[in-house]
Design a protein with these regions (language model features):
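Loop-helix junctions at membrane interfaces
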Residues: 1-162
Length: 162
């Protein structure tokens, strides 16, 4: 199987996993739904598919919004987190940096980016800190679990085969 076909196939599988698991594991917090599965899948995708993880994040977020298990706030967190996880892993080839990239991208940069979105949507900005904290906690949890999964795959020699 050539690399393009492999990456497209893995991206489709990760989107499906994200949407299905996100249906069961979603934490409603006011106007957002914390999605630790999105963060888990983002880190896996950054390592397994490279830049395709950004496509996966966009498609997953769109489907989750259409299904009602995500909100418009899914975009800034998931896409920025996926992109930073990919960039840090791509240039370092270190699994911890993929997880750190997701946490910084979603939990910090993504959380900062929702404030202007809240202003545009005329939402109460008094709840911003709660939302930002939810982004951070959700991304730490999801990235942590994915890091553990990737370590186990690497330990068993399976990561190189994927």
């Amino acid at each position: 199987m050539n690399k393009l076909t492999k990456n497209m196939s893995l991206t489709a599988v990760l989107v499906a996993l994200n949407v299905v698991l996100g249906t069961f594991i979603s934490i409603p917090l006011g106007v957002i739904r914390a999605a630790p599965m999105q963060h888990l899948i983002n880190v896996l995708g950054a390592v397994l598919t490279g830049p395709w993880v950004i496509v996966q994040a966009l498609i997953s977020s769109t489907i989750r919004i259409l299904m009602g298990t995500g909100t418009v706030f899914s975009y800034p967190g998931s896409i920025i987190g996926a992109a930073l996880a990919y960039v840090l892993y791509h240039y370092s080839k270190k699994l911890p940096l993929a997880a750190v990239g997701e946490v910084i991208g979603t939990g910090v940069i993504g959380a900062l980016s929702i404030y202007p979105l809240m202003l545009i949507l005329d939402l109460d900005t008094n709840i911003y800190m709660v939302m930002a904290l939810a982004f951070l906690v959700s991304s730490i949890f999801g990235a942590g679990v994915s890091y553990f999964i990737l370590l186990q795959l690497e330990k068993r020699g399976l990561l190189k085969r994927l």
